[in-house]
Amino acid sequence: MTLAQLSALDRAAFVDAVGWVFEHSPWVAERAWRRRPFGSLDDLVAAMTAELEKGTDEELLALLRAHPDLGSRARMTDASRNEQEGAGLDSLAPAEFARLHELNAAYRTKFGFPFLYAVRGATKHDILEALEARIPACREEEVNEALRQVLRIARFRLEDTLS
């Protein structure tokens, strides 16, 4: 789909086309729709970013919690599964899996949402290092960093969707 085609869609079709880029949180796309037309991918991302930033604390926390744990063997969206496979998280050695599981649990306990990281282009070692480095952060810093990662993930997904 082209950006022009996306901009021409009615609200429901627009949300169907790109509402999934924010994991189980189509409200971002639904609100960004009114900012059409989008002259560039940057314009679309800026519109979605602006709507995300206007989200309530409850909406933002729900959006963060909608993401799966990295390296999890739980059910997840096709997009999340493909992204994690690309980073090698589907083929962790038992010790790596145990360490990632332990760090994910510590992170989730401390912050109340899963560790979020835009894994495209990253290795499993990059991800483990980032997770270890971010656990000591304060909650406010980590919420902000998690939202930055969500926006990076959404941008990658939009790049893959639009031609």
Indicate residue ranges for each PLM-predicted region.
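Surface-exposed, charge/polar-rich loops and edge strands
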Residues: F14
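C-terminal non-catalytic interaction appendages of large macromolecular assemblies
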Residues: E96-S163
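Aromatic-anchored, charged helix-turn/loop surface patch used as a conserved interaction hotspot
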Residues: L3-R11, W20-F22, W27-Y107, R152-S163
